Amino acid sequence: MVFRIASSPYTHNQRQTSRIMLLVLIAALPGVAAQTWFFGWGTLFQIVLAAVTALFAEAIVLSLRKQSIASRLKDYSALLTGLLLAVSIPPLAPWWMIVLGTGFAIIIAKQLYGGLGQNPFNPAMIGYVVLLISFPVQMTSWLPPYEIAATTPDMLDTLRMIFTGHTASGGDLTLLRIGIDGISQATPLDTFKTSLRAGHSVKQIMQYPIYSGVLAGVGWQWVNLAWLVGGVFLLWQKTIRWHIPVSFLVTLALCATLGWLFSPGTLASPQLHLLSGATMLGAFFILTDPVTASTTNRGRLIFGALAGVLVWLIRSFGGYPDGVAFAVLLANITVPLIDYYTRPRVYGHRKG
């Protein structure tokens, strides 16, 4: 009888990649539902387009690399990449944008590096940044939440807008972005930044309809809270660890609080930073990507804190209103260095 000894490591995680990805997709349901409620059917249509494109692009590359298509598509990683990109772009963005962004994310940012587990950068955020740099106007053309929108497109008009750029009555995106005050709307962070540049005071800005009676923007605070619910679910299921989201949110809140205390007339409040834009989505669903994040506990704390500082700096002093995507990619660059200096000590070996 021959006994074969498997090579190390001997510890084994019973959770398969497909189950982990499926849990993340399930955790995303509250956030997707909230975005659909406040911004319309476009969110769901973008997700469908992204999912189809992601699976198609993944299948093509796998076939070219002569790898098993069925087994790789069943790990749901391509679907998750498509979903994260789809919820990050405006719901009425032209159909070809989500197809282009998702295709770039899967083919260039993921498969070109060798596939799942080999990519150094978050594929969804690579796709997002490519679209943002290439098509800045379309990528910042968010609809106002239905509560302050003058016109809300129905399901068929949403489809027409995505595929033709016009509603049945001939309306376009410019018309749909008009709020109840008759002014074209933007996201809370975008509105804050552009209004400051226009010479408005923070006190004046906070009187705008998009901030009326809420902590961080009509609709957006509930969207962020919905993503937070999904993040708590992931923590409860032990799909992600607490280090990255907690260090990211605490650091972002600390930077925002200090900045707001020193310069309340030019910098956004902590609640606006925490409950606007892609804060909670980034904290629990993007930064926690096990492939592109730090792998040690101390490293995760540093990684999350670095991303928090970068988000605050970009939002406060950069040219883009949000900054989560850029912060994630910049933090991804530092992961090898962070992991090198936070390696746990190996006992029984002298320091070389």
From Swiss-Prot:
Assigned GO CC terms: plasma membrane
Localization (cell): Cell inner membrane
Modified residues (FMN phosphoryl threonine): 187
Protein name: Ion-translocating oxidoreductase complex subunit D
Pfam family, one: NQR2_RnfD_RnfE
Transport as UniProt keyword: yes
Cofactor(s) named in the record: FMN
Subunit structure and binding partners: The complex is composed of six subunits: RsxA, RsxB, RsxC, RsxD, RsxE and RsxG.
Gene: rsxD
BP GO terms, sorted: electron transport chain; transmembrane transport
Membrane-spanning intervals of the chain: 20-40, 44-64, 78-109, 123-143, 214-234, 242-262, 267-287, 301-321, 322-342
Membrane topology: Multi-pass membrane protein
UniProt entry tagged with the keyword Iron: no
Function: Part of a membrane-bound complex that couples electron transfer with translocation of ions across the membrane. Required to maintain the reduced state of SoxR.
Lineage: Bacteria, Pseudomonadati, Pseudomonadota, Gammaproteobacteria, Enterobacterales
EC code: 7.-.-.-
Organism: Salmonella arizonae (strain ATCC BAA-731 / CDC346-86 / RSK2980)
Enzyme class at the top of the EC tree: translocase
Family as reported in the entry's similarity comment: Belongs to the NqrB/RnfD family.
Keywords for the protein's UniProt record, in alphabetical order: Cell inner membrane, Cell membrane, Electron transport, Flavoprotein, FMN, Membrane, Phosphoprotein, Translocase, Transmembrane, Transmembrane helix, Transport
Record-linked InterPro entries: NqrB/RnfD, RnfD_bac
